[in-house]
Amino acid sequence: MVAADWSWTRRTLLKTSVAGVLCLGEKLFMPRLARAQARVLPEGELWFYNVHTDERLRVRYRNERGQYDLTALDDLNHILRCHHTGEVATMDPRVIEHLNLVQKTLGGEGEIHVISGYRSPEYNALLVKRSRRAVRHSLHVEGQAVDFFIPGVRPREIRKVALKLQYGGVGYYPRADFIHLDCGPFRSW
């Protein structure tokens, strides 16, 4: 009986610690985003469509108190999985928050059409062989990047908003008409 109680306490402690680190880590490692988020985002809600898997997800992954819903984060990981291999990885919450902040700054409406979230190393290597746009050490492989567009919103406008936030990588691909966001150092291309 004592072992079962200890195991339950350890599991609860682990879940609480992970959520706390995610929330605290956001404030420590992304102070600009955390300040902007406090002003702009009452709660974390996103609406996704994966163009490769034909799946949709509308999810509230963080409440107005800043607490993450671990089940919702799992759902986000699933829809942002590697469409080539089906491999699911843990997406960095910072890239999710970056997407949320950009979407809310644009008015908060509109389904985010995902072209690429997580990429397995196998799929990324294939893309590197096929294209000059893919890079060997992509943040997609780390679960720290998303390529997307929002129907009805010009990618140029999304880029402008993302650049004003001065957080992470912001890539604009005018020929393919999509945006890349990541949670690496601030840079643009």
PLM feature segments, named:
Residues 1-8:
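N-terminal secretory signal peptides
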Residues 9-24:
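N-terminal export leaders
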Residues 25-58:
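C-terminal segment of N-terminal export signals and the immediately downstream linker at the start
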Residues 38, 44-49, 133-189:
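Catalytic cores and adjacent binding grooves of peptidoglycan-active enzymes
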Residues 64-115:
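Active-site acidic/histidine clusters and adjacent loop/turn architecture
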Residues 102-106, 110, 122, 152, ...:
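Sec/Tat-exported extracytoplasmic proteins
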Residues 111-125:
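Acidic helix-start/capping segments at beta-turn-to-alpha-helix junctions
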Residues 122-138:
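Charged, often glycine-rich, active-site loop that binds/positions anionic groups
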